[in-house]
Amino acid sequence: MAFGTDPTPDGLANPPIDDLMKHADSKYALAIFAAKRARQINSYFTQLNEGLLQNVGPLVEYQNNEKPLSIAFREIDEGLLEETLGEDDANEGN
């Protein structure tokens, strides 16, 4: 068993922020995009335990201890999601 750091970082360092920024106009937009998807994933897991399936589950393979935000970032990085602005998002900041 080797000791030390894992060569492939998990969490916010993987995927790198520079790769994620290719899929959003700004860091703010990326944060909102990922947070919304993470809430959907979290709702999916909650509904899965209750036998309801109203949200789409993770689009990438995940591990049981992985956080919904990390899953959302990986989905964004792999190009599986497309950001679209709703009415509330389009009017924000005006």
Curated annotation (Swiss-Prot):
It comes from the Bacteria. GO terms for molecular function: DNA binding; DNA-directed RNA polymerase activity. SMART domains: RNA_pol_Rpb6. It catalyses: RNA(n) + a ribonucleoside 5'-triphosphate = RNA(n+1) + diphosphate. PANTHER family: DNA-DIRECTED RNA POLYMERASE SUBUNIT OMEGA. The RNAP catalytic core consists of 2 alpha, 1 beta, 1 beta' and 1 omega subunit. When a sigma factor is associated with the core the holoenzyme is formed, which can initiate transcription. This is DNA-directed RNA polymerase subunit omega.
